[in-house]
Amino acid sequence: MSALRSLGAAAVLLAVAAAQDASVELVLRDGVAVVAERLRGDATAGFTASVGGKAMVVPAGALLLVRGVATAPPALPSAWLQGGDVLRGAITGGDDAGNRVDVQSPVFGTVAVAVDRLDALAAPTVAEPLRLRLPDGVDEALFVRAKVGFDLLAGALHQFGAPGVRFQPDGVDAPRWFAVDEVAALRLRGAEARADAPGATLWTRVGDRVGVTLVRCADDGVQLQLEGGIAATLRWSDLGALALHGGCAHLSDLTPAAVRESGFDGDVVHPFRRDANALGGPLVAGGRAVGKGLGVHSKSRLAFVAPAGAASFWTRVAFDDSVALLGLEPRVDVRVLVGDKVVFERKDFAFGQSAQDTGLLPVRAGDTVTLEVDHGKGRDLGDRVDWIAPMFLLGRG
């Protein structure tokens, strides 16, 4: 069985809007970022965007990132697959053998997930279930809420269904149903990697992160293939971000050559996060999801070595939208260095200012690119900063 499959027609969403129902921001290979009211075309033939009422041709290979609406995960269970995919939705069913779990997604309809691909199934209030580690010698376990922390129930998974998870703890004669809200997470060891290599990564407005193949952009939405060849049309108003692979190396996929972090008083406030803000939530800046990026908190210094084929570097920097909830007015100094040379700098960068664009910065393979965020006025209070899609652009040919 493929890792994901549709159940009837539910996984193919047919949007009824006659025109694109949400604008998008396009990040292009030449370092330009524009807001488009409409985007049509495909990754093979290229795209046509409507920007300020004028047509703009986007050649094949030039589109790197599409930013849509803000991501705001609802209070729903989440299925965490090997490789990083996350699908959110109600658990509505499964097969008797326990090989499949049916997830009712708000944006994809009902999708069947192969249990062989599953790392974890988490309750709505658990944001990072992979932090719940299985002890050595335990392959399947429920983490059940206790007065303090969690109790671990090792045992055997039997089935998924609308009641939740049918599980048999060790030492118990028969399995029973555990409601999803009754547990923190189900953890499974030995999940299988995805068989295919998706051409893009999609983030939805509800916080899904899914590897996809982009088929076409049309007025009614983005036509996609999910894992296992499932066809789906995602409404533009459900699109958080879409990162197209190829021609670039995202820093969030690379290992830093050096990391230096400290708070105003010395201790690290929040360590940097990959494809998440400094608190572990979705990257959202300027009212739009970011998708690929780095979430940091001052003081932060992250250094990366340009890979083979690197010809230039690009990023934008902004405060994460979560800062708005704090009622603070944080300020930071931000800079980018290539080697020891400062090539981009914004001092006294304040929350509420628009994202700052570095432009294309020339680099060569082996160069060290360093992203710095330093304390500004107001110590380090609220200094949650997002590096938006920092990437090395690879030379062609």
PLM regions: where:
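Extended non-catalytic domains of envelope/secretory-pathway proteins
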Residues: 22, 26-30, 37-44, 52-249, ...
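Secondary-structure boundary/capping motif
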Residues: 33, 110, 338-340
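Bacterial N-terminal signal peptides that target proteins for export
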Residues: 1-8
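Intrinsic disorder/low-complexity segments enriched in polar/small residues
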Residues: 21-22, 346
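Hydrophobic h-region of N-terminal signal peptides that target proteins for export
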Residues: 8-20
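Polar low-complexity intrinsically disordered regions enriched in Ser/Thr and small residues
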Residues: 11, 34, 44, 56, ...
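Gly-Asp-aromatic-enriched flexible segments
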Residues: 176, 180-200, 220, 225-397
